[in-house]
A protein has these predicted regions:
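Active-site-adjacent loop/helix surface patches within enzyme catalytic domains
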Residues: 1-115
Length: 116
């Protein structure tokens, strides 16, 4: 069954985990962090580790918890990082993350035409 038949998706949202580039932050850490904030698990549908591994963290058919007002019509992708070693905002994406992000977005755009 195609996920695109289950809910109307028109938006793909990219987030960072807002974690330091010199620290590891696994998909399990992300899940714990979101549960401590009162969510029922990770709010993003996909998580991209520094090594480029794409982790499915929430079924696409399940509405996300990542961008208020747009959760019902969007897919959330989060990449590990986003802060430098001092805790300041920085594009910390590795080449592996950039590649995986491109592949994932292209796949989602194919499955959900009309997404922006």
């Amino acid at each position: 069954m195609s996920y695109s038949m289950m809910r109307s998706i028109n938006l793909i949202v990219i987030h960072c985990s807002a974690t330091r580039e010199d620290k590891s932050f696994t998909e399990y850490d992300l899940d714990i962090c979101h549960r401590r904030r009162g969510f029922n698990g990770t709010g993003y549908h996909f998580y991209i580790r520094k090594n480029g591994d794409i982790k499915s963290t929430r079924p696409i058919e399940k509405i996300g918890a990542h961008v208020r007002g747009f959760n019902s019509e969007s897919i959330g992708i989060c990449y590990e990082g986003g802060l430098d070693c001092e805790g300041q905002p920085k594009d910390t994406r590795t080449e592996w993350q950039k590649h995986s992000l491109r592949v994932l977005i292209l796949t989602l755009l194919r499955d959900y035409p009309g997404c922006r």
